C-alpha cells in the first residue's frame, strides 16, 4: 500500500507498506473443514517458493560483491598495462574499401587491415581494426600491452558494477525461476487432483439419485 504524508516542514513524504496475506495463510492452515488438503499443500509450496527466493537475496548480493572485486582488479590491471599507440596501415592491396562492398549487404563500420607500429623501439606488425576506406599509409589508433603486443581497449572501471549487478540478478532470477516452475508444476498437478475429486463426487451424487 502507498501512503502520502507530510512532515512538520510541509514536505510530502511517500511511504510504501507491504502487507502479507497473514489472514489467508492462517485460514489455510486452520482446522476449517472447508479447507482441502490440496489447498494446504499448495500454500506450503507457495511459502517455500517465496522463502527460498527471499533467502537467495543475500547470497546473490555476496556473489555480486565477489564478482565486483574480481572484475575491478582485472580492469584496474588492464588500465595500468594497456596503452594507446598509433599504427600505420601497410599493403594497400589488402584494404577493403567501403565502395567495393555489395550494395545488398549492410554497411560495415569496421574492417581489418595489416599495419605496423613501434613500441619501445621495436617494430611490430599485425591485423588491426580500421574504418572502411582506410588506405595504405593511413594511421589508426590501437592499444598495446607493456610488451607491445596488440590488445583490446581496456574496459572502463564502471563495467565492474554492471558485471556485479548482472551476476547477482542472474543468480536470483535463476533460483526464483526454478522455485516458480516448481510452484506452477505443483499447481497443475493439484488442479488435476481437484478436478478428479470433483468428478468423483459428481458421479457419486448421480449414482445416489438413481
UniProtKB/Swiss-Prot annotation:
It comes from the Bacteria. It is found in: Cell membrane. GO terms for cellular component: plasma membrane. Keywords: Cell membrane, Membrane, Transmembrane, Transmembrane helix. InterPro entries: MT1774/Rv1733c-like. Induction: A member of the dormancy regulon. Induced in response to reduced oxygen tension (hypoxia) and low levels of nitric oxide (NO). The chain crosses the membrane at residues 43-63, 165-185. It is a multi-pass membrane protein. This is Probable membrane protein MT1774. It comes from Mycobacterium tuberculosis (strain CDC 1551 / Oshkosh).
